[in-house]
From Swiss-Prot:
Catalytic activity: L-methionyl-tRNA(fMet) + (6R)-10-formyltetrahydrofolate = N-formyl-L-methionyl-tRNA(fMet) + (6S)-5,6,7,8-tetrahydrofolate + H(+)
GO annotations of cellular component type: cytosol
Example GO molecular function: methionyl-tRNA formyltransferase activity
Protein name: Methionyl-tRNA formyltransferase
UniProt keyword annotation of Protein biosynthesis present: yes
Protein role: Attaches a formyl group to the free amino group of methionyl-tRNA(fMet). The formyl group appears to play a dual role in the initiator identity of N-formylmethionyl-tRNA by promoting its recognition by IF2 and preventing the misappropriation of this tRNA by the elongation apparatus.
SUPFAM superfamilies in alphabetical order: FMT C-terminal domain-like, Formyltransferase
Length: 311
């Protein structure tokens, strides 16, 4: 069986790891260190570590791989292939050169578009109608190696980061399973990326999460979809942060300053943008409160909201 080092961290990576465990000999798993999670800051292992522990696989968790003791240990292994999927660190050249068959990455975009750490978020924020999975060889430069295989998938109007993450996670494992035999046999072909067409999807920053209502409704809607259910787009109402998990677009002829609540229905809070498409907030969370449907919030506040300004 092919001896593989797997490197990944979040839920996206777990379906790939499960497939590799079923089909090949995973001799080591490299992931990020345990991190404090939640209000109580409980030290929590990354999802990939949980899978690895279930199968009693050796786990390495370097804070930074380059120059680490873990790297020195990995370099002693007899390995055929390195597979990464959302690992979260660049690999040092010494590790890239280790496996006989090279190092490959499962990336959640149609490269060369959306290189970087947040390709699913950015594709939805940008209003793309499709995205996909790329299997490519790894090089020192971020997400720039030769493409081995690709498969596209449609982004539906009601998709958000959560739904696309789940679809792409499965697609990534399936495409890798189809692609690996030719890599192992040495019969695969690969195509260089066109660097002139490269775009980048940097990790989401806090400032990317705040909604600017002075934009077309479609852009605001895509931002909400592209940040839900994590890290979640937010606005401010009555000096209180308001996270928006779900919304829809509605046509309106009411002319109001962007950010103004122009109407409430039984199920939504409707907010003006800078064009004739308003945003209907359907699922929300006020700071310090539990997440709730707008319908539940409106049962006690419907008559007091119209005319308020979100900023």
């Amino acid at each position: 069986m092919t001896k593989i080092i797997f490197m990944g961290t979040p839920d996206f990576s777990t379906t790939v790891l499960e497939m590799l465990i079923a089909e090949h000999d995973v001799i080591a798993v490299v992931t990020q260190p345990d991190r404090p999670v939640g209000r109580k800051r409980v030290m929590t292992p990354p999802p990939v570590k949980k899978v690895a522990m279930k199968y009693d696989l050796p786990v390495y968790q370097p804070e930074k791989l380059s120059g680490s003791e873990e790297l020195e240990q990995l370099l002693q292994l007899d390995v055929d292939l390195i597979v990464t999927a959302a690992f979260g660190q660049l690999l040092p050249e010494s590790l890239l050169a280790l496996p006989k068959l090279g190092a490959i990455n499962v990336h959640a975009s149609l490269l060369p578009k959306y290189r970087g750490g947040a390709p699913i978020h950015q594709a939805i924020i940008d209003g793309e109608q499709e995205t996909g999975i790329t299997i490519m060889y790894m090089v020192k430069k971020l997400d720039a190696g030769n493409i081995i295989s690709q498969q596209a998938i449609k982004i539906e109007e009601n998709d958000n980061v959560g739904t696309m993450h789940d679809k792409l996670s499965v697609l990534g494992a399936d495409l890798l399973k189809e692609t690996l035999p030719s890599i192992i046999e040495g019969t695969n072909e690969s195509v260089p990326q066109d660097d002139t067409q490269a775009t980048f999807a940097s990790n989401i920053r806090r400032e990317d999460e705040r909604i600017s209502w002075n934009k077309p409704g479609r852009q605001v809607f895509n931002q909400i979809r592209g940040l839900s259910p994590w890290p979640v787009a937010y606005t401010t109402m009555d000096d209180t942060n308001l996270k928006i998990y779900d919304a829809e677009l509605v046509e309106t002829n009411k002319i109001n300053e962007p950010g103004t609540i122009i109407e409430t229905t039984k199920k939504a809070i409707i907010v003006a943008t800078n064009d004739n498409e308003a945003v209907a907030i359907k699922d929300m969370q006020l700071a310090g409160k539990k997440r709730m449907l707008a319908a539940n919030y409106l049962s006690g506040a419907q008559n007091t909201l119209v005319g308020k300004k979100l900023i």
